[in-house]
UniProtKB/Swiss-Prot annotation:
<dbReference type="GO" id="GO:0003735">
    <property type="term" value="F:structural constituent of ribosome"/>
</dbReference>
<dbReference type="Pfam" id="PF00312">
    <property type="entry name" value="Ribosomal_S15"/>
</dbReference>
<comment type="subunit">
    <text>Part of the 30S ribosomal subunit.</text>
</comment>
<keyword id="KW-0689">Ribosomal protein</keyword>
<protein>
    <recommendedName>
        <fullName>Small ribosomal subunit protein uS15</fullName>
    </recommendedName>
</protein>
<dbReference type="GO" id="GO:0006412">
    <property type="term" value="P:translation"/>
</dbReference>
<dbReference type="InterPro" id="IPR023029">
    <property type="entry name" value="Ribosomal_uS15_arc_euk"/>
</dbReference>
<dbReference type="InterPro" id="IPR009068">
    <property type="entry name" value="uS15_NS1_RNA-bd_sf"/>
</dbReference>
<dbReference type="InterPro" id="IPR000589">
    <property type="entry name" value="Ribosomal_uS15"/>
</dbReference>
<dbReference type="GO" id="GO:0022627">
    <property type="term" value="C:cytosolic small ribosomal subunit"/>
</dbReference>
<comment type="similarity">
    <text>Belongs to the universal ribosomal protein uS15 family.</text>
</comment>
<dbReference type="InterPro" id="IPR012606">
    <property type="entry name" value="Ribosomal_uS15_N"/>
</dbReference>
<keyword id="KW-0687">Ribonucleoprotein</keyword>
<dbReference type="GO" id="GO:0070181">
    <property type="term" value="F:small ribosomal subunit rRNA binding"/>
</dbReference>
<dbReference type="Pfam" id="PF08069">
    <property type="entry name" value="Ribosomal_S13_N"/>
</dbReference>
């Protein structure tokens, strides 16, 4: 797709904004929403030709783990904490099973893509340390 005419920012300015928001602790999805809603940049990839994560990797600021995997791990840790206090909550137990299944499938994909090290496995105890 072509670059929208109404975008007045240069590629360098957009990259500086992305790096600034990343230093402030914003996730890649939050950065994209901020750029869309406050700066009128509909899609970073359309404008710059690179995704936000590619820009962060090029500047050595990318996270160790992919954002979607980390979000699932956070949800699993929160449900495990909830189940520690409410062991009879069967709906949450099922939800935890489903989320952990998603984590394993996604981790398998990322290992094949090279985003995670070979042999990486989801471990709930390590996940709790990873998130906190």
């Amino acid at each position: 797709m072509a670059r929208p005419e109404w975008v007045t920012y240069s590629d360098e300015e957009i990259e500086e904004m992305i790096l600034k928001f990343n230093k402030e602790g914003k996730s890649t999805s939050e950065i994209g929403i901020i750029l869309r809603d406050q700066y009128g940049i509909p899609s970073v990839k359309e404008v710059t030709g690179e995704r936000i994560t590619q820009i962060l990797k090029r500047n050595d600021q990318a996270g160790k783990y992919p954002e979607d995997l980390m979000n699932l791990i956070k949800r699993a840790v929160n449900i495990r904490d909830h189940l520690a206090e409410n062991p009879k909550d069967l709906h949450s137990k099922r939800g935890l099973t489903i989320i952990e299944s998603r984590i394993r499938r996604l981790a398998s994909y990322y290992v094949n893509e090279g985003a995670l090290p070979e042999g990486w496995r989801y471990n709930p105890k390590e996940a709790a340390l990873l998130v906190k």
